Amino acid sequence: MADPENEVLRSTFPSYMAEGERLYLCGEFAKAAHSFSNALHLQSGDKNCLVARSKCFLKMGELEKSLEDAEASLQGDPTFCKGILQKAETLYTMGDFEFALVFYHRGYKLRPDREFKVGIQKAQEAINNSVGSPSSIKLENKGDLSFLSKQAESMRAQQKPHPVRQLIHHPKRESKRKGSLKSEKIVRQLLGELYVDKEYLEKLLLDEDLIKGTIKHGLTVEDLIMTGINYLETRSDFWRQQKPIYARERDRKLMQEKWLRDRKRRPSQTARYILKSLEDIDMLLTSGSAEGSLQKAEKVLKKVLEWNKEEVPNKDELVGNLYSCIGNAQIELGQMVAALQSHRKDLEIAKEYDLPDAKSRALDNIGRVFARVGKFQQAIDTWEEKIPLAKTTLEKTWLFHEIGRCYLELDQAWEAQSYGEKSQQCAEEEGDMEWQLNASVLVAQAQVKLRDFESAVNNFEKALERAKLVHNNEAQQAIINALDDANKGIIEELKKTNYREILKEKKEKENATMLDGQTRTAKEKETRKTKDEPEKVMKQWVQEQTEKQLEGVLSKETLGVTARQPEQRQREDPEKASWRKELGAKERGPGDTAKGQFGEAGRTEQNREETREIYRRPSELDQNLSDESSPRESEGLEKRLSKTDGGELEALGKTESGEIKEMEITENSEKIEKDEKEDEPIE
């Protein structure tokens, strides 16, 4: 078998580099480092290969080897950016944040890439985090320090020569100890607020009268001061060696402890924390992680509620903002009831502390929740309350559009058109083409519901032009479809209007014919009435006149007959009695006829009286008729009356004379019969 090393060395340098990069991406860092080593055997000192192998060592945790390869890549070219970046990354991983920051800055000056910028921020943050939060213990030049006496006495027995003596009698050792720190700047960054305490303790050492003083059990003030200084130095060394992740965990634990609640935070730290938290919450929500945004917001809200107003002057405004963030995350998660409660809390805080911007924000979000769940009228009421609080024209554009959209959903097309036109006007003032597009579509849709198809087509055409300007293909297609529907609506409306006009004309003709017929019949009736009235009046008048004359004649005749009867009886001769008997016997048959004639005469008389009563009218009717008749008619009536009066009177005279004669005959026959009955002998 052949030697594997010789077999490996038979490959080319690019093949080893490609193999190492592939293995590195697969996570096989040891094999990748071996491939890069083989490549360096073929081409030693290659900068890119050294940087690649340094990355593998860094992933494997061999930090020293990684640093050696990174420094080796810079030997030939100190400005090699990849080598500088790799060295900075290695130093950062080793915990040497200061030197890492130096190399990040050096690389950023040579080539301002994103990697160097991120490295600078990362190293600076690591330095700040490694310093940690201020400790709860702070030494002051007051109070009783006897609580340290027992601990100091036990430590004195175990300690080596006195530290003050070392400080006084061994200045070289002191300088060496101080020289262990890289610089006072590093110590200041590591200790943070405690660096002031360290300086204070060092100043106390210069006061010889103070350090000679003793406390209980023989413990001197000098011993206590040196104990504090030694503690701070050991702490700074420890924090410097920690990696950023451990420093963050330590800060997180310290923030949860009670001493942080009683201690004032720096305003700058509080502001940075709040701003950073709000940015993280917003970033998580916009990136699609609504659950993470909700958890982050609830966590920050819990912390802010623990602070007092001295630490956070605008605490109320911040709490309302966090409730708003929580509500927005709940909307994205579909938790509408919880979202409504969160936004209402935001609104309550805004009203309580008179925060107009927060009130506008809360009303906006509450309206969105109502619109999402389909309660459009409540959304309209909420957004209409927000209108006076809207500051910018663009905000009004959006607000009017949403209100109009809700009215359109409620089938209130007039209101939807009105708000759509307001939105369109504001969008034109702002010069926002997309909102002009949205407003035009809203107005057109409202006009379609109002069946104003011509105006709808005009607005759809405007919207189509704006959609082309903003290159919105989906909107263009939707508007084209809506235009087709609107044009079809116009055609249908024209058909309906034509049909309605035809029906209207037909009804008008029918009504006209009916009116003509009615007017004609009415006129004919009127003419008939006018013609018949004078004839009726004449007949009535003639009948009344004849009846009066008949009454007068009958009354005279009856009086004359009654007066003649006794005279005739006296004049009659007794001789004629027999003749009367014979005549009565002979004329018994004709007497019956006379009786029938007399009965008929009585009937005619009765009929005449009835007709007289029927045709008898009050004088007022005669007066009205006489008043209404014209002079010409009165003249005609007089002529007719004169003519008819003569003829009718003659006829009446004849009939009356005949009737009177018949009545006389019947009366005479009755009288004769009575006399005969009286003359007959009584058996």
Swiss-Prot record:
Query: Taxonomically, what lineage is the organism?
Result: Eukaryota, Metazoa, Chordata, Craniata, Vertebrata
State the GO CC annotations.
Answer: 9+0 motile cilium; 9+2 motile cilium; cytoplasm; extracellular region; outer dynein arm docking complex
Q: Where are the TPR repeats?
A: 13-46, 47-80, 48-80, 81-114, 275-311, 320-353, 360-393, 397-430, 437-470, 592-625
Q: Which Pfam families has this protein been placed in? A: TPR_8
UniProt subcellular location: Cytoplasm, Cytoskeleton, Cilium axoneme
Enumerate composition-biased segments (Basic residues): 167-179
Q: Note the superkingdom of the native organism.
A: Eukaryota
* Keyword field: Cell projection, Cytoplasm, Cytoskeleton, Repeat, TPR repeat
| Tissue specificity annotation | Expressed in trachea multiciliated cells.
Query: InterPro entries under this entry?
Result: ODAD4 (IPR040111), TPR-like_helical_dom_sf (IPR011990), TPR_rpt (IPR019734)
Give the protein's biological function.
Answer: Component of the outer dynein arm-docking complex (ODA-DC) that mediates outer dynein arms (ODA) binding onto the doublet microtubule. Plays an essential role for the assembly of ODA-DC and for the docking of ODA in ciliary axoneme.
| Coiled-coil portions | none
Oligomer status and interactors:
Component of the outer dynein arm-docking complex along with ODAD1, ODAD2 and ODAD3. Interacts with ODAD1; this interaction may facilitate the recruitment and/or attachment of outer dynein arm docking complex proteins, including ODAD1, ODAD3 and ODAD2, to ciliary axonemes. Interacts with components of the IFT complex A, including IFT140, TTC21B/IFT139 and WDR19/IFT144, and the IFT complex B, including IFT46, IFT52 and IFT57. Interacts with CFAP53.
Asked if Repeat is a keyword of the record, the answer is: yes
Q: Which organism is it from?
A: Bos taurus (Bovine)
Cytoplasm recorded as keyword: yes
Compositionally skewed regions (Basic and acidic residues) per UniProt: 521-537, 566-590, 602-620, 629-675
- Quote the SUPFAM superfamilies the UniProt record gives: TPR-like
Give the GO terms filed under biological process for this record: brain development; cerebrospinal fluid circulation; cilium movement; epithelial cilium movement involved in determination of left/right asymmetry; heart development; lung development; mucociliary clearance; outer dynein arm assembly
Note down the stretches annotated as region Disordered: 158-179, 510-537, 553-683
Q: How is this protein named in the record?
A: Outer dynein arm-docking complex subunit 4
